[in-house]
């Protein structure tokens, strides 16, 4: 009896994979209605914002840039035949280049924030870093001065407290006053760039022990979460929010998210069902800077299966996709794929230096960006289209 029940369970488990409309199973085009996110505002943000406002401790992106306390270093990655020659290449200061505590992942620019390409006349990059199991910081970089400053991401847990955020932050996208950050298993988080808070430069995160102030592990500024978009299907039909990018050629503008899946990776079901690799787009509201929703639900406008494993980031513009695939540490290189729907992708093997990650596209400069993750070999790279 138990044996029969077990066989029945395995059979149902296999059927569940086979009939899930979100999985590829020899398909390429998927139905966007099956990829939904629930919008949830952060309940304790207004009270904390009111407090920091009353203390004169709300600052701006411009002020963060003007207070930048670290310098990028002009440095080219090691190149060989077949590599894509970057138009620009920058390294972090020595401490950030060498640290194994923090690992860079995502990149976006002021050209994502606004179509004109600048934020208050500043050309800016933002790069995300994660500290495994602990926290996330983002670097605000002024492209004119080549100076930068780190800011910690936080989640308000009460009307008078906040905590660090322990996610991978594999991709980011800046849209108006919102910084979108992927949360691998849960969806997309949104952070309020109109509410950057100045805190005490002291140990600990959140309310200080004496209850008289706030701190963020010695960082001067924190960026609070304003809302999140939860993957409604959950673990019953998982989607990996590995990277994210903005497409201004779509109408309306869209956010595209995609999955990092290892070559040959399968689910742990009896049939060893291949883990799908999907790219999904969500429409944006240019006025509110939110995802477009109906009764609090964001539904994908486009979903597609793209059979390229180990992808760390991608951008799309005018129906052309530029895709960043990593292959490991040096001497290995990263690959660039250029793809259009219904066509075979063009592969540029070894195009990137090792550790290529998330991507961002700058319509004004006609260039795309990536950031490399491995310690002592970290770069921000710009390539002309």
Regions found by a protein language model. Give the residues of each.
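Blade-level signature of beta-propeller repeat domains, shared across WD40, Kelch, NHL, RCC1
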Residues: 357-385
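Fungal secretory targeting signals
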Residues: 1-19
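Structural signature of eukaryotic scaffold interfaces centered on beta-propeller domains
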Residues: 97-121, 165-175, 235-254, 307, ...
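Surface-exposed loop and turn segments in beta-propeller and other repeat-based domains
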Residues: 64-100, 146-163, 203-238, 286-307
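Loop/turn-rich, solvent-exposed surfaces of beta-rich toroidal or solenoidal domains
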Residues: 112, 123, 254-357
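Beta-strand-rich domains and repeat architectures in extracellular enzymes and scaffolds
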Residues: 30-134
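Beta-propeller blade signature
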Residues: 135-146, 192-212, 269-289, 333-343, ...
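Short loop/turn segments immediately following the C-termini of beta-strands
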Residues: 112, 128-132, 184-185, 193, ...
């Amino acid at each position: 009896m138990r044996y029969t029940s077990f066989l029945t369970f395995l059979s149902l488990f296999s059927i569940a994979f086979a009939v899930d409309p979100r999985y590829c199973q020899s398909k390429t085009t998927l139905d966007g209605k099956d990829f939904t996110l629930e919008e949830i505002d952060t309940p304790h943000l207004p009270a904390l914002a009111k407090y920091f406002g009353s203390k004169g401790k709300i600052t701006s992106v411009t002020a963060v840039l003007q207070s930048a306390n670290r310098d990028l270093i002009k440095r080219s990655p090691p190149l060989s035949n077949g590599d894509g020659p970057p138009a620009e290449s920058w390294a972090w200061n020595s401490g950030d280049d060498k640290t194994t505590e923090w690992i860079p992942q995502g990149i976006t620019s002021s050209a994502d924030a606004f179509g004109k390409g600048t934020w208050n006349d500043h050309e800016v990059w933002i790069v995300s870093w994660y500290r495994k199991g602990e926290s996330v910081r983002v670097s605000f970089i002024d492209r004119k001065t080549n100076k930068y400053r780190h800011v910690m991401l936080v989640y308000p847990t009460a009307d008078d407290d906040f905590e660090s955020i322990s996610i991978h932050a594999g991709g980011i996208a800046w849209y108006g006053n919102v910084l979108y950050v992927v949360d691998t298993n849960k969806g997309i988080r949104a952070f309020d760039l109109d509410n950057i808070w100045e805190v005490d430069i002291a140990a600990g995160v959140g309310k200080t022990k004496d209850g008289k102030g706030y701190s963020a592990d010695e960082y001067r500024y924190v960026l609070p979460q304003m809302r999140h978009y939860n993957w409604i299907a959950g673990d019953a039909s998982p989607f990996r929010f590995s990277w994210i990018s903005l497409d201004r050629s779509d109408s309306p503008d869209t956010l595209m998210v995609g999955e990092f899946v290892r070559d040959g990776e399968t689910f742990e079901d009896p049939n060893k069902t291949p883990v799908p690799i999907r790219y999904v787009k969500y429409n944006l509201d240019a006025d509110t800077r939110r995802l477009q929703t109906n009764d609090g639900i964001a539904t994908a406008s486009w979903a597609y299966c793209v059979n390229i494993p180990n992808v760390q980031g991608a951008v799309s513009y005018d129906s052309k996709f530029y895709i960043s695939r990593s292959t490991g540490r040096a001497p290995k290189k990263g690959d660039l794929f250029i793809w259009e729907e219904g066509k075979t992708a063009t592969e540029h093997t070894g195009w990137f230096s090792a550790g290529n990650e998330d991507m961002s596209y700058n319509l004004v400069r006609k260039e795309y960006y990536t950031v490399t993750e491995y310690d002592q070999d970290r770069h921000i790279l710009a390539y002309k289209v």
